[in-house]
């Protein structure tokens, strides 16, 4: 069983990030506290965060950039200037007009919020200086934190139980608050009343993301390494021991593995690699590591999730629950799920990881800042999306591989320069297409209606070819983003070749870096053996310049 510090179990801190993906699948109604809001109010919500020892506090923003709060207001965590509870939404006037980029909260609870302008505001519980304002007085209203941050652009925040971290745009981490286990990373165990840069092993590193456990801190740097510090009683630092770390220490067991993201549960840790693999370590009394048993692990241990590539991991400091989403859209959960111990990843019927925490975590809270959109009416974009491939309203159909795709001439001419000229004087209502496959051309037309692409990474190369052929710059960028999600050692050279062929410079650099980071395996693949001579020559030359062949 993991060690629990009295008073720490309740609302432990967790990092929450705004997300623009899967907006239609998010439903704030799954959190009971939103039953206090009217339907009209729910339709205006743009972002939402549910927290508190019983999921009894909420902060949300509206389409008008107003911030509202409701709940028990423990320690003044609603920021409205008093400690009165409220079952009706109250507007947080001091932050009206501010757009939230990142938000996190702690056990008191205390709130740390970063705006899209890079400013930091804090309020709520402050017995351990976790607000960073130099005092230990609770903050009843949002306070702008500028000490040592005045010239910094903060892009991400994270809270432990009673300590806080922020990440700046230049890759620096600042920390403050409770430090009994070294979680502030200052090298001592004295509390830190104001923001202090975390240095040591991070001094010359560029940090890409941060996370906090109950009393520990973590950072992922641009090289894919993970640095950890603070409390380690359950092995949650992944160092093979249970001793606390007062300064950042690299997780050596992940040598050669590039981590993209880290997430912290109550006393366990998850990381996601660039190949879509999950590793877990720390407390495991509820099966939250997903290893098939309940034994704690002090070293990173692989989590097997079918044969699906994972693109998202989720954990929440107030629960012993873990979740993940695959490239194919499957959502898995494990750990403590409504009182049951699920010791292996379990495939759910959910569309997003947020639903796992709404329906199975205790308490029912959000693990990140949700983004939602009103659905009281169809927007222009939604209306256009509905009309794609609709034979009832179309005035044009494409014949591709023996199958029809229905479209509308006026929209195609508005959205695509190629169609603007090719359809200008055409009276044909059927166009045969042989240059591209049915899935690729259908995905292209769907993109013109929705501004999104829905192709798996392995087929997106064909769409990249089309985007290059039609000079569709934005589509080309989206294709590159999709292709990146499917890279592995076996196809890295093929994707690099495609990137060079279609002058996709961002993808080319990404594939090259991936090949360098996995050089030993990549050079043994059939793709490398069959590599074009000129491409091979350029690859070796460039690899040499970045020191890939140094002893």
UniProtKB/Swiss-Prot annotation:
One of its GO terms (cellular component) is cytoplasm. Keywords: Cytoplasmic vesicle, Repeat. Its main location: cytoplasm. RCC1 repeats lie at residues 64-115, 117-169, 171-222, 223-274, 276-326, 328-382. It holds the Pfam family WD40_RLD. CDD domains: BACK_RCBTB2 (cd18529), BTB_POZ_RCBTB2_CHC1L (cd18354). GO terms for biological process: cell population proliferation; digestive tract development; liver development; lymph node development; spleen development. InterPro entries: BTB/POZ_dom, RCC1/BLIP-II, Reg_chr_condens, Signaling_Regulatory_Domain, SKP1/BTB/POZ_sf. It is found in: Cytoplasmic vesicle, Secretory vesicle, Acrosome. The BTB domain might play a role in targeting to acrosomal vesicles. This is RCC1 and BTB domain-containing protein 2. The lineage of its organism: Eukaryota, Metazoa, Chordata, Craniata, Vertebrata.
